[in-house]
Amino acid sequence: MKSRTCFAVVVLLLCPLAGFAQRRPHGKRFKPESIHVFPANLVTVRSDSPLYQVQIMVRTGSADDPAGKEGTAYLVARALIEGGFGLPRKPVTTQALAEITRPWGDAAFPTVLVDKQATTFSVTVPRSAFAEYVRRVLKPMFTQPLWLPKEMDRLRRDTLTDIQSGLRFEDEESLGLLALDNYVFSGTPLAHLARGTVQGLQAITSPDLNGFYKKYYTLGNMNVATTINDQQDLSKLIDALPAGEPLYRPANLRASVVAPGRHVLIITQPNAIATGLHLGYPISLRRSDSDYWPLFVANVFLGLHRDSFGRLYQEIREARGYNYGDYSYIEYAYGRPDFLFPPPTTPRDQQYFSIWARPVGHEYAHFILKAMTAELDRFARQGMTPEEVADAKVKARALYLNYAESVSRQLGYRLDDLFYGMRDQGYLEQMLSRIDAVTAAQVNEAIKKYLQAQNLDYVVVTSEAEGEKLATDIAGDTNVHSKTPAEYHISSPIPPDKQQILDQDKQWAAYPLNIPRANIRVVKAAAMFETAAEP
């Protein structure tokens, strides 16, 4: 007889949410939600919607890919939905699944997001149709995968095309962001794309997929978040998932060590019209750590994602107009450059600090590389004033409504909470009170502890015509070009505020990167993501 987890219900109120609702911006409607927390791997968010939302996070991802078969986690997840499931004599293919789910809306067709340590499936279905949905879709999808050869060939081919054509040559910004995501973790299970590698994808067989599925896809290895509160429907949901216990994990992915010195990977595309710049290094910080919220506030001040508030944006974009934006991060942010607010469900045991400078003109690349490094160095050494911390806290509080704006996002954060061991006091639940409690001393202590500019990994994406030249310039500290006063539209006599910009430019230009040529590699985009090893 299959063992199933028993659920006792505990009700928690999102008190910070209710308090914030009284101070919400004009015109913004936001309803406090109550959350039922089960003493297991299932949480529910109460909703009055006639639709059920279900998110299922499997505690596995590309970090568990077998060596030489990188992409296994990704193909397994995609194949559960698109590789055929159910009875072999009448398989539910992608086309059949679309027909089955069409009466229930587009969101009833399952979607999946695969990251390094988590794979998350999402569906939305009418309450009235849930029993039929479980019977026809959810249960056979998770318990009767068929790995149809034709569908597997299609999924493999599509994924290879995404990497070989799309990512390498058509998406300059994603190329740089994902290359850095790998580069800072060189030599670890995190050092390849969640989608896999070219050679790894080509080597994967159907038995590989089935073995991975049987090992990791068990109820005990899943976290579930849903708007279902009816006990019978909850039982149907749990019964639809494969039985099994949690997987023992001896590996410690928080053990990454920052390599001494500065290292640069320059990736060249045939016809890149601008140069993208990135830097980063691993940090041992999780959302459950006491330093998280002080560093969160600090990062809001330094480089809040897709916002003009941050210092990096103000200095490089607003005051000087070099690019479309400059941002910093204390954890991986999925979906850049597209998402305004990075979505949840990509939790990791090992995170990294990074700065992303959106593409600049080739002639300014060396200068902006110095500028972003110098600004990080200054921030790490000087920290923040009490006034700056106070301003950053106000901005950080304002993010709350965006992070919690939908039930879907709330479910995702609850899954992350389970991953990080924060079930009893979740990320959104504690966000406002923890930000309010942050002091300037705590912020500066966190900056001192986690931020530095001496040991950095850089990823630069530029054109093939610029790659070797830029490597020589960086190593030799030559050809550092900023804009001229005329390009800044500064008239003579120079106003005092504009003189400050020119003076700061001189300091940035003189900032020593001290990167020897031996620490700089130039590789063509066509060589990226071929194997798990560095190109």
Name every feature range the model reports, one short phrase each.
Residues 11-20:
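Hydrophobic h-region of N-terminal signal peptides that target proteins for export
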Residues 23-27, 186, 218-219, 223-285, ...:
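An aromatic/glycine/proline-enriched structural segment found at the starts
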Residues 25-27, 55-124, 132, 191-195, ...:
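M16/MPP (pitrilysin/insulinase) zinc-metallopeptidase core fold and M16-derived inactive scaffolds
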Residues 27-32, 37-40, 48-55, 59, ...:
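Extracytoplasmic
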Residues 39, 56, 74-76, 121, ...:
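Buried hydrophobic packing residues in well-ordered domains
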Residues 94-212, 257-260, 370, 374, ...:
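Acidic/histidine-enriched segments that form metal/cofactor-coordinating
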Residues 151, 161, 165-168, 177, ...:
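Non-catalytic, conformational "gating/processing" segments within enzyme and secreted inhibitor domains
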Residues 166-218, 238, 320, 327, ...:
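Scaffold signal of the M16-like zinc-metallopeptidase fold and its non-catalytic homologs
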